[in-house]
Regions:
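Conserved NTP-donor binding/palm subdomain of two-metal-ion nucleotidyltransferases/polymerases, i.e.
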Residues: 2-123, 129-390
Length: 390
């Protein structure tokens, strides 16, 4: 199952996404057997929701679509079983070496939140390592046969590791939580049993992670069906302490996911949520952005930001010039003779893009998008950090 990307650039499909929201809510709720005609099946296929429709319908779908969705579901279920077996081996190895870790994102949601793992496809395994164990994790993985193309550190994770066709991404902090003390975040990780090294995110931090991860890079990587499905199953499987969530948002100085509930009331119709306190104007701005993620170039957004050339803006831009960022971007080892050449190339490319987009006048569409970001920032402090890897 692949989550859709093409819908972002097509106004007709975008309009359908709004009509699909009650259907997606019904599929997640699973309170009654799901049934649909061929036309709706075709639309579900466009959004790669066929396996979920097959699972909820008990196979009661029009014959051609039943066979197609059944094949997709079985393929995903088989792949999930293979992934689960291999991941359990990794988890056992980490337990033996007393490496404290927490599965996050897809590998956590598939096996712990969704009704069956086959409904939540994912590519790599994201695990978050306890800060006191980060110094040992790379050597432990190397001894176990996990290899990487180059050893470099990104904004929130170590280099990708591979073994037997599987990909592992060890994190030293959560994505888009930069500036928040890691030990404070780790307090929201719960051991799966007494004395275990394997932990699980608290429902409140998991909810916050899904929301903030979706906001990376000016919402350019947003995937609304995927986000809503993840949130829907999380709310269905977990009891959210809304007061605790509010305390976490205040402590971490980050926007609350509650704004998303107000932005999509037809989807979160029955979700237990606190009284809506956010601006309806900010919610409309968030809804508009998520229904049609921006198609602007990253540097076009960076060089037209209202706060450009501020101290925070400069710190973010300088972090992009870290040698490890260039190594990850061009897959060049530190000892490579061409590294200096690639570093100069990357610097000149950034300089060219900065001058190019600074000289261009802002379009009406870009100005409108910037206004939407400002509304979200003002009412919820939820404007994402700039991309660190451009």
């Amino acid at each position: 199952m692949r989550w859709p990307n093409s819908w972002r650039k097509n106004s007709e499909v975008m309009e359908f996404a709004v009509e699909l929201l009650p259907v997606l809510r019904e599929l997640i709720a699973g309170e009654q057997s799901f049934s649909c005609d061929g036309a709706l099946c075709a639309e579900l296929e466009r959004f790669h929701l066929g396996p979920l429709a097959y699972f909820r319908s008990g196979g009661k779908l029009p014959a051609p679509w039943r066979r197609q969705f059944c094949g997709q579901f079985r393929q995903q279920a088989g792949n999930a079983l293979r992934q689960q077996f291999a991941f359990d081996q990794l988890a056992a190895m980490l337990e033996e070496n007393r490496i404290r870790f927490t599965p996050i994102k897809g590998v956590d949601l598939a096996f712990r939140v969704y009704p069956v793992p086959g409904l939540r496809p994912f590519c790599d395994w994201d695990i978050w390592i306890h800060p006191d164990d980060c110094a040992r994790i790379r050597d432990v993985l190397k001894r176990d046969g996990w290899s990487c193309e180059l050893e470099a550190i990104a904004d929130h994770h170590f280099a990708m590791r591979r073994k037997n066709g599987f990909c592992l991404e060890p994190h030293f902090t959560l994505p888009n939580f930069n500036g928040i003390p890691v030990r404070e975040l780790w307090k929201e990780c719960i051991p799966i049993q007494e004395g275990a090294c394997r932990h699980a995110l608290s429902p409140e931090l998991n909810l916050l992670l899904l929301y903030r991860h979706n906001n990376i890079d000016f919402f350019r990587k947003s995937n609304l069906p995927k986000l809503l499905a993840d949130l829907g199953f999380l709310l269905k499987s977990s009891r959210i302490n809304w007061e605790k969530l509010a305390r976490l948002c205040w402590s971490f100085r980050c926007g609350s996911p509650e704004l998303l509930f107000q932005a999509f009331p037809e989807f979160f119709l029955k979700a237990a949520k606190p009284e809506e306190k956010h601006s309806a104007e900010a919610a409309r701005a968030l809804r508009s952005i998520l229904l049609a993620p921006p198609q602007f170039e990253t540097y076009e957004l960076i060089m037209n930001a209202r706060h450009r050339f501020s101290w925070e803006w400069w710190k973010t831009r300088l972090r992009c010039l870290r040698p490890d960022n260039v190594r990850l971007k061009y897959l060049k080892q530190n000892q490579s003779g061409n590294f200096a050449l690639f570093y100069c190339h990357d610097f000149l490319k950034k300089l060219y893009n900065s001058v190019l987009f600074s000289a261009q006048s802002s379009s009406a569409e870009l100005a409108e998008f910037q206004n939407k970001l400002e509304k979200i920032e003002y009412f919820s402090s939820a404007v994402p950090n700039h991309s660190r890897q451009k």
